[in-house]
Each structure stands twice: as C-alpha cells, then as structure tokens.
Amino acid sequence: EELDSFIEDHCRNLGLECVGKEKFSCIDELSQNKVAQQLIGSAPAGIKLEEAIPPRPPVMCAGCPHRGLFYTLKKNKLTVLGDIGCYTLGAVAPLAAVDSVICMGASVSGIHGFSKSQQGAADNKTVAVIGDSTFMHSGITGLVNMAYNESNATVIIVDNSITGMTGHQQNPTTGFNLKGDPAAKVDLEALCRALGIDRVRVVDPYDLKACETAIKEELAVSAPSVIISRRPCALLKYVKHNKPLKVDTDRCVSCKMCMKAGCPAISLVDGKPVVDTTLCTGCGICKQLCKFDALQEG
C-alpha cells in the first residue's frame, strides 16, 4: 500500500468509501508520523534522544553460507551479476562483491548478454550469482539460452535449501510444498545438465579454498558452466552448529583480516577483534582468513 493503492482499489470496487492516495504519496515509506500528519493534521511529539542511534545496515547473518562465496569472489576481483534474495546483501560493505542487481533471473540472462556483447572479453572475470528458489522462479530460461546460444559464462547457484529472504518458505528444490508436506524434489544438478550444461559441480561455501579452485577452473573453460554453492541456511532449525570460536589474544596481532568477511559475530573492542559467542555458529570462515591461527574453538 506504500506504493500502489492495492487495498484502496479493492475497497472502492466493493463500493466502500475510503481515504487513500489523495492523502498519502505513492512514493517512499509510510511511517507513524506521516499517517498522523495526514489524518489528524500534526505528528505526535516524539522522544528526542541526546545521542544519535548508530546506524544498523542490513547484513548477512552470522554463519550465512553465502559469506564465504562472496568473500572469494571479491578476493579474485570478479564482476558479479547478482539477483534477488538474501545474497543481494553481498553488495553491502565490507564485502561489496555484487556489481549489479536488476530483477529476479536477470543475473543469468545478464551474463549471457555480457558474454555475447563483449565477444568473450569478460568470460574469465564475470560470474552470475542466483539463489536456488530464484533460479527455479526465473533463472531456468536464462540458462537454457546460455546452453543453446553457447555462452562461455559461469553461473553460481547459491543453494541454502530454503527461500530465506521472505521467511523460510519451501521451494521446488527442498522436497516439501508450501504446506510443509513432502513433495517432489527438483535435483538441481540433473536439471542443469538436462538444460544442456555439461559442466556442473557442487562446492561447500564454508571451504574457501575449494570455492576458489572451482571458480578459477570454471572461468578458465570455454563452455557454459554451473557451480552450485550448497549449504543450508544457518537459521534453519535442523542445522547443527559448531562450537563458537574465540580469539587467542596471545596470537592475535590485530591485522583485522577476520573483519573482512563482514560477520556480525565479530567486532572490535579497543582495536582487538572479539567474538560474540551468542551469535557465532563456528562456521570457520574467519578462522580460514587468519594467518596467525588466532581464532580457536571455544
């Protein structure tokens, strides 16, 4: 209703009188103050804080399986065509690994266009990243185009076994329908091969070296390829986590490499990294980044 008069239109169609877009803009968000200003003529006096509240930009959760992949893409200075989902947060600092986001499925069709328009010049330094549910929604036809029209491009499907962005809904790859009942499960690897992609491989995004190896190998091949980055969403109830990590202060030299992954479980206190054990899932991404082995199991 913030943008389009959806409920308002339905009310009017039912013959009901209602107040809507003649008072509220179709641009920007609604707020309590805006509603009060339009309905009673003045906004209520709010509480003024002496100190400004620090900003809290959106960030991928602690233990998010997408974090390791995006760190690897950023490390290798690749151009990344993103898509719509939790992984869109890969565009946010400090990862800042996503270069474009247009609409659902545009990553796959976009990289196909890149490959053709650049006549191969961008093939070894550009990838598309799309989620499992978004791929099922609108990425399949783009992949068919890549196979049929022979694009030398790599698509990375980030498979977290759920539709995380909108509240953990099931999708055709999970084996359950929206009611939670068992349903036919789409095999992503078999589907990609059936669409004409011969090079399909699966990696664990928690394994940074394996991710980097897979990406480099697929980018070096003159053929369309798919990498499936597979690990369940860290917020799924059935996912078992490792013990939280802790910082060995004797080994830590405050190089801040562990901060480059952008994990909300790690913060700096007096210039030293500190792990919040209530958030840490023990995924080990930060441990792999530390050259001094200063992050240990708690």
Regions found by a protein language model. Name each.
Residues 1-45, 243, 297-298:
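Terminal amphipathic helices with adjacent charged low-complexity linkers/tails
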Residues 116, 122-123, 245-254, 274:
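Generic long, charged, amphipathic alpha-helical segments
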Residues 91-228, 238-240:
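Thiamine diphosphate
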Residues 253-274, 281, 285-298:
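Iron-sulfur cluster-binding cysteine motifs and their immediate structural context
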Residues 4-5, 24-28, 87-89, 135-136, ...:
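Short gly/pro/ser/thr-enriched loop/turn and capping motifs at secondary-structure boundaries
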Residues 28-32, 50-52, 58-66, 133-137, ...:
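Active-site glycine- and acidic-residue-rich loops that bind
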Residues 4-13, 217-268:
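Glycine/aspartate-rich loop-and-adjacent alpha/beta segment that forms the canonical ThDP
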Residues 46-108, 117-120:
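Active-site diphosphate/adenylate-binding microenvironment
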